[in-house]
Amino acid sequence: MLNLLVITLPILAAIGWVTLNIQKPAREQWDRQFGDNKPF
């Protein structure tokens, strides 16, 4: 069980980190492109 956690936690952390790093520049680019008048 502990082995599974040791393997799984870094993978989840890496996936979360990558997701955040992908979303943040995309959101900044979105704001640059459309400004305040967002379609939703």
UniProtKB/Swiss-Prot annotation:
UniProt topology in membrane: Single-pass membrane protein
Localization per record: Cellular thylakoid membrane
Record InterPro entries: PSII_PsbY
Transmembrane segments: 4-22
GO cellular component: photosystem II; plasma membrane-derived thylakoid membrane
Matches recorded under Pfam families: PsbY (PF06298)
GO terms assigned for molecular function: manganese ion binding
GO biological process, one term: photosynthesis
Main location: membrane
Keywords: Membrane, Photosynthesis, Photosystem II, Thylakoid, Transmembrane, Transmembrane helix
Keyword check for Transport: no
Membrane in keyword set: yes
Family membership: Belongs to the PsbY family.
Main function: Loosely associated component of the core of photosystem II (PSII), it is not always seen in crystals. PSII is a light-driven water plastoquinone oxidoreductase, using light energy to abstract electrons from H(2)O, generating a proton gradient subsequently used for ATP formation.
Subunit note: PSII is composed of 1 copy each of membrane proteins PsbA, PsbB, PsbC, PsbD, PsbE, PsbF, PsbH, PsbI, PsbJ, PsbK, PsbL, PsbM, PsbT, PsbX, PsbY, Psb30/Ycf12, peripheral proteins PsbO, CyanoQ (PsbQ), PsbU, PsbV and a large number of cofactors. It forms dimeric complexes.
Protein name, per record: Photosystem II reaction center protein Y
Lineage: Bacteria, Bacillati, Cyanobacteriota, Cyanophyceae, Synechococcales
Gene it is expressed from: psbY
